[in-house]
Amino acid sequence: MRKTSLVTILFAMLITFLSACKSDSEEGGTTGKPYDPNQPIKLTSFYPENGGMATKVIINGENFGTDLSQIKVFYNEKQAAVVRSIGTKIYVITPRQPGDNCTITVEVGKDKASFEQQFSYKTQVTVSTITGTPRTEVNAVDGTLAAAQFGLTHFVCVDREKNIFVCERSSYRLRQINEQQNMVTTLATNITAPFIPMVETEGQKVFLPLWVQGGNLLQFDPETQWAKKQVKPQNVTLDQYISAAVNPEDKLVYIKALNGNLAKMDPKSKEAELVTTGLDAGWTYDAICCFDSLDPDMLYICYRSKHCIYRYELSTGNYVLYAGAREDPGYEDGKRLNARFNFPSQICFDLNGIMYIADSSNHCIRSIDREGAVSTVIGVPGRAGYVDGTPDDALFDEPWGVAVDEEGTIYIADTKNKCIRKLAIQ
């Protein structure tokens, strides 16, 4: 009833807003007075006082003018879409995730004013299933999203065209999902020891490291219809590749080997050089690498079987424990070094520098913010299952893989459910 009442109020406000536009047009031939640069803009109120992404808000005040090219509205640092202005009212759309408590600022020309009262942003988190049938016995069916079936879905990545790539590690396959085309396709089968797929910085080529003697990378390129091609870094000898990550600044692919060596490779020429040695040589074959999206000098390595995450600084060679405790599994949110994980697997960063972790044996997705606080995004710690919905309801069964696209949508390889899930945080 409360939600219905709010919708009714907002609808009434919108009708009032449009009526004001119409009345003003009938009286003066324009939709409001133009902005007067010799007078200050004034803010009086806004409504509603809280909401989530795409909430429609009306800002009341004076001297806004009607030229939308001169009007900007910000929720903290995030710019809102301005739909209409009649000089005394501005109609805006709330942007995605501007922060929990938002200062609304209006800029008109060179004039600027901010409300003292803050807008309370309500984050909405939901998970849905893109494709796959939970716990199916059939594990290799291509076709539509509804018809497709998978083996154990271990790792995932996504390109700029929103193609989703899924490594079925124990079934030795790489699959491609295209939501827009409603299609799942197998790109390669009988792959020896495939690990975590990654997309290079141009958002096109996909590289798949192989954990084999001598090491290998498989390359999949849309310009060759995703045909599989075997490539090796030149001038560097690595053994048993276990993970690769692209650096957002130098655009090079960094490859970690089981023997602890770290090399960097030009994805075009394949020229490579050794970066360092001794990064926990032979410690574990499940080491998943990812660069910080805001600080490309920092490479993070998640050691699944050791239940912790390390950080390697390229410029100094400093290598330290970043989150969790070595060989101490468990579940605890809080400060990163006090937090506990249980077989954390794939990690990724969104464009805001938030790290997401597929905490597989805790059956949930965790995050680490820029202040180092660990929290549970979705899933019930210690409880396996399959349920779509909100954080209070959603269940996973050992999710190993997580990836995020440029819009902040998170893709989850829900391993034992044999599904690919989508997490929307708005």
Give the positions of each predicted feature.
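Ser/Thr/Pro-rich low-complexity tracts
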Residues: 22-129, 159-165, 175
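C-terminal motif of bacterial Sec signal peptides marking the signal peptidase cleavage site
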Residues: 17-20
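A short loop-to-beta-strand structural motif that recurs across blades of beta-propeller domains
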Residues: 172-176, 215-219, 260-264, 307-311, ...
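Short loop/turn segments immediately following the C-termini of beta-strands
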Residues: 109, 161, 169-170, 209-213, ...
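Residue-level detector of Asp-centered blade-edge/turn motifs that repeat once per structural unit
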Residues: 158-161, 200-203, 246-250, 292-296, ...
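Conserved beta-propeller blade signature
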Residues: 163-166, 205-209, 252-256, 298-301, ...
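Gly/Pro-rich loop segments of beta-rich domains
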Residues: 59, 123-154, 181-195, 223-240, ...
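Blade-level signature of beta-propeller repeat domains, shared across WD40, Kelch, NHL, RCC1
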Residues: 397-426
